[in-house]
């Protein structure tokens, strides 16, 4: 018996170099130019990836909506239940180290030649315990732990997406509110222009065509006002869904939150920080880690499993009276099962596990590349919109002067109604575009917040 134990111990030590005991080594190297060659990086603690959402989105009303969404959103609640499922699986993997017990009481009654019935009772308890010499249970536990962390990363990704979606929808409403205010103001101004043109026609300084053209443009603006109101209603409904509520009007401040719009640039931190900050990148690495341990499990299937089993129980002797105190029976067995040929299933399973591990590795690499690309796009979007805003301000200032001059010239009969119409229409489009560009600037901030992992809790 001692020789057998020594033999098994030596075999276990020999096989420890075969890969079934190795642990996954987390990724620690990320290309310095992951965000793009033109993006300067710095290892700073105040980069946007380390800020909480409250520090980025400072509008009090928006903060209320985000907190409400974090409490009620159904997608986030589903992600929380997914974490609970993974926690249960992790607990099961931990308990696999413990022995199993089974109790199966039995009773029989028999008689011979119409004699007195004889009752027999048996109360057996069976136990078995797998000794994890070859790492099957250990690797299963490590895989379950990786999957648990992945479920937590998924929950964080859903949370980050929810915060970004609420912020994006809220600022969409503010953009539409501003565009609606501009359109309503223009509608009123255009009505005054129509009345002025009609007065000029009555004075012989304009014709019917001018009045009709002015009216047509005025009606176009009226319909655009209705379109904007419809869009506002649709966006409010979308935000209500994010808050897990039925459609209703959303109260808002009506002003732009510009606390971060005044920055010349955003510090984004160094790319390696994304491994810790961005949940989808972490999740992709957890998938790789789980696949790594699944491959280890597939390798361990080639080695024997050692199970200690035993049983103990009480039975009364057959043919004795019911008051017989009975007998105690106990047995113990150690078994070793060595797989020899399983129709190629173990070999096939190992090949599948290795292939899935390579797939997970490529997915992780692609997740990193996607993340770097998203950071680059968000930075460029923000900076481009910020640069454009300078020119939009100058354009609107020039168009206001042009409209004022053209209107005066028309009143004195020195220009046509078409020039006034063109000046007013161009000014309206420029003002609407300026508001949309301001929204694009804020979108860049939101996208950057999400691209860098959603900040800290």
Q: PLM ranges: what are they?
A:
Residues 1-16:
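Sec-dependent bacterial lipoprotein signal peptides
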Residues 18-36, 67-132, 230, 236-251, ...:
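A small-residue-enriched
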Residues 220-248, 394-452:
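Short segments within alpha-helical structural elements
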Residues 146, 153-270, 381, 385, ...:
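Periplasmic alpha-helical coiled-coil/stalk elements that build and connect Gram-negative outer-membrane
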């Amino acid at each position: 018996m001692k020789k057998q134990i020594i033999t098994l111990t030596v075999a276990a030590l020999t096989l420890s170099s075969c890969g079934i005991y190795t642990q996954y080594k987390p990724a620690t190297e990320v290309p310095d130019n992951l965000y793009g060659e033109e993006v300067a990086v710095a290892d700073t603690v105040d980069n946007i990836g380390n800020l909480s959402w409250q520090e980025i989105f400072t509008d009090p009303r928006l903060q209320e909506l985000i907190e409400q969404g974090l409490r009620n959103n159904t997608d986030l609640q589903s992600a929380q239940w997914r974490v609970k499922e993974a926690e249960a699986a992790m607990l099961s993997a931990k308990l696999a180290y413990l022995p199993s017990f089974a109790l199966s009481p039995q009773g029989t009654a028999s008689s011979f030649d119409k004699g007195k019935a004889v009752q027999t009772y048996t109360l057996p308890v069976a136990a078995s315990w797998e000794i994890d010499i070859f790492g099957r249970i250990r690797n299963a536990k490590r895989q379950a732990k990786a999957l648990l962390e992945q479920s937590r990363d998924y929950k964080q990704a859903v949370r980050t997406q929810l915060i970004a979606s609420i912020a994006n929808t809220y600022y969409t409403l503010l953009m539409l509110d501003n565009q609606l205010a501009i359109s309503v103001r223009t509608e009123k101004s255009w009505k005054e222009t129509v009345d002025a043109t009609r007065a000029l026609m009555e004075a012989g300084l304009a014709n019917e065509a001018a009045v009709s053209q002015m009216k047509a443009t005025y009606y176009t603006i009226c319909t655009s006002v209705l379109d904007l109101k419809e869009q506002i209603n649709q966006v409010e409904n979308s935000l209500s869904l994010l808050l897990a509520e039925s459609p209703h009007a959303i109260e808002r401040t009506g002003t732009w939150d510009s606390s971060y719009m005044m920055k010349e640039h955003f510090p984004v931190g160094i790319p390696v920080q994304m491994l810790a900050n961005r949940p989808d990148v972490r999740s992709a690495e957890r998938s790789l880690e789980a696949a790594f341990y699944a491959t280890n499990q597939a390798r361990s299937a080639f080695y024997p499993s050692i199970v200690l089993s035993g049983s103990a129980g009480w039975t009364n002797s057959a043919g004795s009276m019911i008051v017989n105190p009975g007998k105690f029976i106990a047995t113990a067995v150690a078994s070793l099962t060595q797989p020899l040929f399983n129709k190629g299933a173990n070999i096939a399973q190992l090949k599948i596990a290795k292939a899935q591990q390579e797939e997970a590795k490529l997915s992780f690499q692609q997740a990193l590349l996607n993340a770097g690309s998203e950071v680059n796009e968000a930075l460029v979007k923000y900076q481009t919109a910020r640069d454009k805003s300078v020119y939009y301000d100058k354009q609107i200032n020039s168009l206001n002067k042009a409209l004022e001059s053209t209107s005066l010239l028309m009143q004195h009969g020195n220009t046509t109604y078409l020039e006034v119409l063109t000046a007013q229409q161009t000014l309206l489009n420029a003002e609407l575009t300026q508001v949309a560009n301001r929204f694009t600037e804020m979108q860049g901030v939101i996208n950057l917040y999400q691209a860098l992992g959603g900040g800290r809790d």
